[in-house]
């Protein structure tokens, strides 16, 4: 059984992700981190899901049973855990969240002592330990060796200071009216505080978490309500975060939801103009052709990687870059954060608006994405795509018609994701039927 997916361990709380799995996984991770342990402290944070209490207690039980001391900091954004793990000199950090998923899902993400997400080799090692009864049993401690747990509620200030430090000192948000949709999630306290302390006129929506309403018709995956509020309050811009605030969706003053690649493009150009862009901009293989053209136009080098913000980070380290992201809204400013941080990205976009004295729509309209169609097709078997008879011919045929294509399996479900991109939406709709028919046959869907 494989535990780790594209972003940690994730599943239905109380079913796949129950208290037993959480406790044993924490023990396995603790054993893995022991080799480099310096302080014997591990930081644990969570979003606002009800199941977070169950999983948090199970993780604390697992870690203290093998001798770790645990620092619990309650609901905080995922990027805050990455920052605070290093800032508080912990041996590791653990975030309990299923990000943009509904409340009934949950997940566990791990960070090393420097606040970096674990690579696949580290995850594979933790899985190996998880299934090794002997190693788990030998790691148990007794008597005075059993660890302690303490809850600290005031670390939010450290993270707020770090976020504010990413905003240019010579600017103020006093001239901006901003609507924030915090998705009843982990940023419900942090985001309004940061924007208000920097001077913005702030309207907050969906900031009443009850454990069951996280991401429910709100936040980064449902920005239409935010769009209505932006128009209603005549705001300059709207920012929507997801449940753990590691992604951002922007709504302009007209109530138009920005495309993720438009956001990446204009922020990359902003960094270049300031002389702050190091090396290549990194986006994923799903990025829009219009982004590539925009970056080429401004002579900004560009590289692509697999889908997932940890792969964006890996590629940035490889090429010595400091900016990249995903179409979905994970945007990484690695000079300021170790992972995608919706708040940092929101402040940088605000700084761009103020620096150029332009509206959000004027800025975002510089990158006009080509139409894309993304269909998720249920399948019964995940066959090796490189060996599928007829697939190369299908791709070449699409290419001749001016259609870019990308086909990839879901990391967590029996789905294949079919992405087509071209300048003509009607052509896309027609060819998607051909593509779906092909995969239905070869993958026995």
Swiss-Prot record:
<dbReference type="GO" id="GO:0000287">
    <property type="term" value="F:magnesium ion binding"/>
</dbReference>
<dbReference type="GO" id="GO:0006048">
    <property type="term" value="P:UDP-N-acetylglucosamine biosynthetic process"/>
</dbReference>
<dbReference type="Pfam" id="PF02878">
    <property type="entry name" value="PGM_PMM_I"/>
</dbReference>
<dbReference type="Pfam" id="PF02879">
    <property type="entry name" value="PGM_PMM_II"/>
</dbReference>
<dbReference type="GO" id="GO:0005829">
    <property type="term" value="C:cytosol"/>
</dbReference>
<dbReference type="GO" id="GO:0004615">
    <property type="term" value="F:phosphomannomutase activity"/>
</dbReference>
<feature type="binding site">
    <location>
        <position position="246"/>
    </location>
    <ligand>
        <name>Mg(2+)</name>
    </ligand>
</feature>
<keyword id="KW-0413">Isomerase</keyword>
<keyword id="KW-0479">Metal-binding</keyword>
<keyword id="KW-0460">Magnesium</keyword>
<keyword id="KW-0597">Phosphoprotein</keyword>
<dbReference type="InterPro" id="IPR005844">
    <property type="entry name" value="A-D-PHexomutase_a/b/a-I"/>
</dbReference>
<dbReference type="InterPro" id="IPR036900">
    <property type="entry name" value="A-D-PHexomutase_C_sf"/>
</dbReference>
<dbReference type="InterPro" id="IPR005841">
    <property type="entry name" value="Alpha-D-phosphohexomutase_SF"/>
</dbReference>
<dbReference type="InterPro" id="IPR005845">
    <property type="entry name" value="A-D-PHexomutase_a/b/a-II"/>
</dbReference>
<dbReference type="Pfam" id="PF02880">
    <property type="entry name" value="PGM_PMM_III"/>
</dbReference>
<dbReference type="InterPro" id="IPR016066">
    <property type="entry name" value="A-D-PHexomutase_CS"/>
</dbReference>
<feature type="active site" description="Phosphoserine intermediate">
    <location>
        <position position="99"/>
    </location>
</feature>
<protein>
    <recommendedName>
        <fullName>Phosphoglucosamine mutase</fullName>
        <ecNumber>5.4.2.10</ecNumber>
    </recommendedName>
</protein>
<feature type="binding site">
    <location>
        <position position="244"/>
    </location>
    <ligand>
        <name>Mg(2+)</name>
    </ligand>
</feature>
<dbReference type="GO" id="GO:0008966">
    <property type="term" value="F:phosphoglucosamine mutase activity"/>
</dbReference>
<comment type="function">
    <text>Catalyzes the conversion of glucosamine-6-phosphate to glucosamine-1-phosphate.</text>
</comment>
<dbReference type="InterPro" id="IPR006352">
    <property type="entry name" value="GlmM_bact"/>
</dbReference>
<dbReference type="InterPro" id="IPR050060">
    <property type="entry name" value="Phosphoglucosamine_mutase"/>
</dbReference>
<dbReference type="GO" id="GO:0005975">
    <property type="term" value="P:carbohydrate metabolic process"/>
</dbReference>
<feature type="binding site">
    <location>
        <position position="242"/>
    </location>
    <ligand>
        <name>Mg(2+)</name>
    </ligand>
</feature>
<dbReference type="GO" id="GO:0009252">
    <property type="term" value="P:peptidoglycan biosynthetic process"/>
</dbReference>
<comment type="similarity">
    <text>Belongs to the phosphohexose mutase family.</text>
</comment>
<dbReference type="InterPro" id="IPR005846">
    <property type="entry name" value="A-D-PHexomutase_a/b/a-III"/>
</dbReference>
<feature type="binding site" description="via phosphate group">
    <location>
        <position position="99"/>
    </location>
    <ligand>
        <name>Mg(2+)</name>
    </ligand>
</feature>
<feature type="modified residue" description="Phosphoserine">
    <location>
        <position position="99"/>
    </location>
</feature>
<dbReference type="InterPro" id="IPR016055">
    <property type="entry name" value="A-D-PHexomutase_a/b/a-I/II/III"/>
</dbReference>
């Amino acid at each position: 059984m494989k535990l780790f997916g594209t972003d940690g361990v994730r599943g239905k709380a109380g079913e796949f992700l129950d208290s037993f799995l959480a406790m044993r996984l924490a023990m396995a991770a603790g054993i893995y981190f022991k080799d480099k342990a310096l302080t014997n402290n591990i930081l644990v944070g969570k979003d606002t899901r009800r199941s977070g209490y169950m999983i948090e207690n199970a993780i604390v039980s697992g870690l203290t049973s093998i001798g770790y001391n645990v620092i619990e900091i309650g609901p905080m954004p995922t990027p805050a855990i990455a920052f605070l793990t290093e800032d508080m000199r912990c041996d590791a950090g653990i975030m309990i969240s299923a990000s943009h998923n509904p409340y009934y899902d949950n997940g566990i993400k791990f960070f090393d002592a420097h606040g970096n997400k674990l690579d696949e080799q580290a995850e594979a090692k933790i899985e190996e330990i998880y299934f090794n009864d002997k190693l788990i049993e030998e790691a148990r401690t007794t008597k005075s060796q059993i660890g302690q747990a303490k809850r600290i509620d005031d670390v939010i200030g450290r993270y707020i200071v770090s976020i504010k430090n990413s905003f240019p000192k010579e600017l103020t948000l006093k001239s901006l009216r901003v609507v924030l949709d915090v998705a009843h999630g982990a940023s419900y306290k942090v985001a309004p505080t940061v924007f208000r302390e920097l001077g913005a006129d702030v309207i907050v929506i969906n900031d009443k978490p009850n454990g069951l309403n996280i991401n429910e018709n709100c936040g980064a995956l449902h920005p239409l309500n935010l769009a209505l509020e932006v128009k209603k309050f005549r705001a300059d811009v709207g920012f929507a975060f997801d449940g753990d605030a590691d992604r951002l969706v922007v709504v302009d003053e007209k109530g138009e939801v920005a495309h993720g690649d438009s956001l990446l493009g204009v922020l990359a150009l902003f960094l270049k103009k300031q002389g702050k862009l190091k090396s290549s901009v990194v986006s994923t293989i799903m990025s829009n052709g219009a982004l590539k053209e925009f970056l080429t136009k401004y002579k900004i080098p560009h590289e692509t990687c697999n889908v997932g913000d940890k792969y964006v980070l890996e590629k940035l380290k490889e090429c010595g870059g400091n900016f990249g992201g995903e179409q979905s809204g994970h945007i990484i400013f690695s000079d300021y954060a170790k992972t995608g941080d919706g708040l940092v990205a929101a402040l940088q976009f605000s700084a761009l608006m103020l620096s150029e004295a332009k509206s959000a729509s004027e800025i975002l309209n510089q990158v006009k994405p080509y139409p894309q169609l993304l269909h998720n097709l249920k399948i019964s078997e995940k066959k090796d795509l490189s060996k599928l008879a007829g697939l190369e011919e299908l791709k070449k045929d699409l290419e001749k018609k001016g259609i870019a294509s990308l086909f990839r399996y879901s990391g967590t479900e029996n789905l294949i994701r079919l992405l087509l991109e071209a300048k003509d939406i009607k052509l896309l709709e027609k060819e998607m039927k051909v593509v779906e028919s092909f995969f239905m046959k070869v993958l026995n869907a």
